[in-house]
Amino acid sequence: MKRINELFDVEEEFKVVSIHSDSRYVGKDSIFFCVDGLSVDGHKYIEDAVFQGAKCIVYSKPLAYKHRGVLYIKVNNVLDELNRVADVFYDHPSYKMTMIGVTGSSGKTVVALMIKEVLSHYLKMGYIGTNNIEYAGVIEQCPYTTPETIFMQRHLNDMVKRDVKGVTLEVSSHDGVHFDIAIFTNVYEEHLDFHGTMEHLMASKAKLFTLIDEKGYAILNTDEVRFYNLVKDSIRCHLLTYGIEHKAHVMARNIQLFIEFDLQIHDDLRHVSVPVLGRFNISNVLAVITSMLALEMPMDQVLESVGYIRGVDGRMELLEHPYPFTVIVDYCQH
């Protein structure tokens, strides 16, 4: 709970119980943000929000009518204000845990879940993805394709209360969340109906890395040459790299059946085996290992962590069975 003048530069001091961008969930003494989305314009639901108890309306378009006893705050961009206010309302939870964001066209889920699984051997971890949220015994389906900012900040706040120390997050929209480590997997021509061109798509992915402060880490895939060249000179944080074809801090050499390979970390070379299939999964594993370096794990612990890496259910998953043929389950993008 916050007072309205803690969230906005206003003279009023009434208490705010909750914040919403969906009028169906608005309750007494709440703020309703009129987000103008791709398919729904929140300005059309002001009447519903006020009827259900909203005490403040944040809007950006001209209004024909304003209800008495309701505070109306006009802003240039409602979504930007929602991202800012949600972070404040829930007491900046992402600054209180180690936040690891994973972005790219594919591999986000696999890398984020692998990191969560590995780090769970050392500290209490949480995970926020496109499918669900997991932390401290809580498993909840995510009702959005991309976790909506209020939903995400509320759960991050709950993680802090439950003493979670680190979070891996699949990143599509990142405003309002502070990241310590950002990982890039790959980029290809997806969602060009939204971004328009490959250049705009890469610029959208690159924004995350420019927001990491000097103490943080950007982890880039050197095999994605165009994106690497776009980002490497624009960041202000530490840079770590991984790759198979191009020189990097962490590399896989002499790959055998996409299961065994020589792991090169700087000048150290070790033969390792991981239970994953596919060349792309070797790249995912390298991203996970590089994140361990960013967390400044001792080298022996980094090598130990390789033994904790497991494949993700349904993602090039090899099923064990007694019959004379191979069964692989792969039901969606990686």
Sequence positions of predicted segments:
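Structural motif
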Residues: 31-34, 58, 168-170, 183, ...
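Short, hydrophobic beta-strand segments that form beta-sheet elements in well-ordered domains
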Residues: 16-21, 53-60, 168-170, 217-221, ...
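Short acidic, glycine/proline-rich loop/turn micro-motifs
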Residues: 18, 137-141, 274
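N-terminal leader/targeting and accessory segments in enzymes
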Residues: 1-84, 88, 277, 297-298
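Phosphate-binding loop of NTP-binding sites
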Residues: 80-222, 226-236, 265, 286, ...
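Short, ordered loop/turn segments at secondary-structure junctions
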Residues: 61-63, 130-131, 187, 244
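Short, conserved catalytic or interaction motifs in soluble domains
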Residues: 37, 189, 311
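Adenine nucleotide phosphate-binding catalytic loops in nucleotide-utilizing enzymes
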Residues: 13-14, 195-202, 206, 216, ...
